[in-house]
């Protein structure tokens, strides 16, 4: 059994080193996306950093960072509509009233045509 002494300290050191490198890749990807203005979400960061999405979700600090950046991007993209001035509202109302009057005239014209056709049909019988 003495020959099979386990070197767990080396395994732990290598695991920490791997985790550190992975974090650096993720930080690089997040920084790159922030600078370039690209969409930051779990899929895009996982793809860019070549890590799994489950790893990103598992690391709470990275998860919170991605979620906060994602929320910040969403709120930045929401643009409020400019309020209409009273003048533009008046113009819109006038335009709509004119359109309604045109449609009413057309409707009346079509109703008269229908009555005439009914009259012609009745006279043929």
Swiss-Prot record:
GO molecular function list: DNA binding
Keywords, sorted A to Z: DNA recombination, DNA-binding, Transposable element, Transposition
Function (record text): One of three proteins encoded by transposon Tn554 required for its transposition.
Taxonomic lineage from the root: Bacteria, Bacillati, Bacillota, Bacilli, Bacillales
InterPro entries linked to this entry: TnpC-like
Protein name as catalogued: Transposase for transposon Tn554
Organism of this sequence: Staphylococcus aureus (strain Mu50 / ATCC 700699)
Highest taxon of the lineage: Bacteria
Claim: DNA-binding is one of the keywords in the record: yes
Biological processes annotated in GO: DNA recombination; transposition
């Amino acid at each position: 059994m003495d020959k099979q002494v386990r070197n767990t300290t080396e395994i732990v050191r290598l695991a920490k080193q791997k985790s550190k490198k992975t974090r650096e890749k993720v930080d690089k990807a997040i920084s790159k996306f922030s600078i370039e203005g690209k969409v930051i979400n779990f899929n895009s960061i996982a793809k860019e950093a070549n890590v799994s999405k489950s790893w990103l979700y598992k690391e709470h600090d990275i998860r919170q960072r991605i979620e906060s950046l994602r929320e910040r991007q969403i709120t930045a993209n929401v643009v409020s509509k400019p309020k209409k001035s009273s003048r533009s509202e008046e113009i819109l109302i006038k335009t709509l009233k004119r359109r309604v009057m045109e449609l009413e005239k057309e409707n009346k014209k079509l109703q008269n045509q229908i009555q005439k056709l009914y009259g012609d049909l009745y006279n043929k019988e």
